[in-house]
Amino acid sequence: MLDVNKKILMTGATSFVGTHLLHSLIKEGYSIIALKRPITEPTIINTLIEWLNIQDIEKICQSSMNIHAIVHIATDYGRNRTPISEQYKCNVLLPTRLLELMPALKTKFFISTDSFFGKYEKHYGYMRSYMASKRHFVELSKIYVEEHPDVCFINLRLEHVYGERDKAGKIIPYVIKKMKNNEDIDCTIARQKRDFIYIDDVVSAYLKILKEGFNAGHYDVEVGTGKSIELKEVFEIIKKETHSSSKINYGAVAMRDDEIMESHANTSFLTRLGWSAEFSIEKGVKKMLSMKE
């Protein structure tokens, strides 16, 4: 158990990844200040969690508490036609403000959450504004670290995360639901390859990073299994595990012209820390199916 005085300032605590991480941080004995939007209700009530509206962030600076690390998870993908200005607030202005508050918060450790969409060699028109905003913040964070050489900034780039309690519209929960109901599925040829990383492994990567001591600097850390697998193979695994009679209509949906056809994590950084993913896609799907809905 860690020293309970280790306090984490966290954004995105009500998100899929954030909620899972929050549970584990509590188990590890961390205390958490969870920033949220005024209209968002807390997802977990615990004595180790203090929920705080984002606009009240300055109040923390007025206190005498020391923050061990800032963990930024809040993200706006722009999937629901969110105005670009709103995406910019969440993906650039909020984390940049947190960077600027680091001296007042008495912390020199910042962990930011990114995704494989943001890799500079990837181009995906469907999420251009999201990718542009995330890349903008990464560049700003590099400038900040150059100007504050005692700061440790880690950009955690997550591959395709999946697991229980994820949004129903995400590909794995969506296919599982369809398969359970024996409903036919229309999809592309499903030759895209993704590095599917189970949520428990993602959380363990965050915890590993939090517990390690790093030299000051700017780090880009990729989180995944290190191996990619075709969507078609994943669909067939789910069909087998659910004993479904669903028909999968491969090629019924046209592929996007700029589809990212392959992505996998370079796990060398985390491997050097002694971390490795425990869940294969088969093991992860089985665990999801074993959980109560």
Swiss-Prot record:
Its EC number is 1.1.1.341. It catalyses: CDP-alpha-D-abequose + NADP(+) = CDP-4-dehydro-3,6-dideoxy-alpha-D-glucose + NADPH + H(+). Keywords: Lipopolysaccharide biosynthesis, NADP, Oxidoreductase. Substrate binds at T113. It holds the Pfam family Epimerase. GO terms for biological process: O antigen biosynthetic process. InterPro entries: Epimerase_deHydtase, NAD(P)-bd_dom_sf. GO terms for molecular function: oxidoreductase activity. The keyword Oxidoreductase applies. The active site is at Y130. Pathway: Bacterial outer membrane biogenesis; LPS O-antigen biosynthesis. It is an enzyme of class 1 (oxidoreductase). Belongs to the NAD(P)-dependent epimerase/dehydratase family. This is CDP-abequose synthase. The gene is rfbJ.
